[in-house]
């Protein structure tokens, strides 16, 4: 059985399999993926565009959505200004319109859950409000929340919506600690102009996919899978076929 969904349901499936026929269970249970932006990033404008697209496309309803932004302290304010400006320029509306950049949430119940996650947050610098109620659709302005600590609930919980949290960091070690400080580990993004730093970050980040100076790249020839409570097994590539096969060995003496 292969399941994509919440950790709660994934654990229930594992329990039922253990109590019944020991059916193999493979799980993809979402993520809380970080973008780590260092002050040596060569093109901060490109990084800002990628960060915004990485969280707000499909209204944040994507398993690898880059919902946590970690920015080095020396460029924090300037970078936040960039992403706020880009976000506020994006058009929210009818997904069938060619001018629309951000569509609706999947249901009113889900929209309300996302909005409720923002109710106790004080430092919203963009969005976070419901709009276009007259259309009967489930729309909101994408939200950016600053001054977040790595252990804050909004930083830890998968919102699965257009909400980006922003946290400052001071050093590479600090960034690694913050990026790994969740129970999920599906994807991550790193922005730096130093290849040696890129390799160190790829090795240190507890995520199944790490993007460097880009985000969201995918191909059917390479595996996609999570660390920690983002699940087990792999999708895509030849590795994904293993979970669908029962292997058998036969010894025959003639």
Which residues fall in each region the model found?
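ALDH superfamily catalytic-core signature
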Residues: 7-149, 212
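Conserved C-terminal structural/oligomerization subdomain of aldehyde/semialdehyde dehydrogenase
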Residues: 36, 91, 132, 139-254
């Amino acid at each position: 059985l292969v399941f994509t969904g919440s950790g709660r349901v994934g654990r229930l499936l594992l329990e039922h399999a253990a109590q019944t026929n020991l059916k193999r269970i493979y799980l993809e249970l979402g993520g809380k993926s970080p973008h780590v932006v260092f002050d040596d990033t060569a093109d901060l404008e490109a990084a800002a565009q990628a960060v915004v697209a990485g969280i707000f496309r499909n209204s944040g309803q994507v398993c690898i959505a880059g919902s946590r932004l970690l920015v080095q302290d020396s460029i924090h304010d300037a970078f936040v200004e960039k992403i706020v400006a880009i976000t506020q320029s994006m058009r929210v509306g009818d997904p069938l319109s060619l001018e629309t950049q951000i569509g609706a949430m999947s249901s009113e119940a889900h929209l309300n859950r996302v909005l409720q996650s923002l109710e106790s947050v004080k430092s919203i610098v963009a969005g976070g409000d419901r709009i276009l109620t007259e259309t009967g659709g489930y729309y909101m302005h994408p939200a950016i929340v600053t001054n977040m600590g790595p252990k804050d609930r909004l930083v830890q919980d998968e919102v699965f919506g257009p909400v980006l949290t922003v946290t400052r960091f001071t050093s590479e070690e600090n960034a690694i600690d913050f990026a790994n400080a969740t129970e999920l580990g599906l994807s991550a993004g790193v922005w730096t102009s130093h290849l040696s730093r890129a390799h160190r970050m790829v090795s240190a980040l507890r995520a199944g996919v790490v993007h460097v100076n880009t985000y969201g790249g995918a191909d059917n020839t390479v595996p996609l899978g999570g660390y920690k409570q983002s699940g087990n097994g792999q999708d895509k590539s030849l590795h994904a076929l293993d979970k669908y096969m029962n292997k058998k060995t036969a010894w025959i003496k003639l």
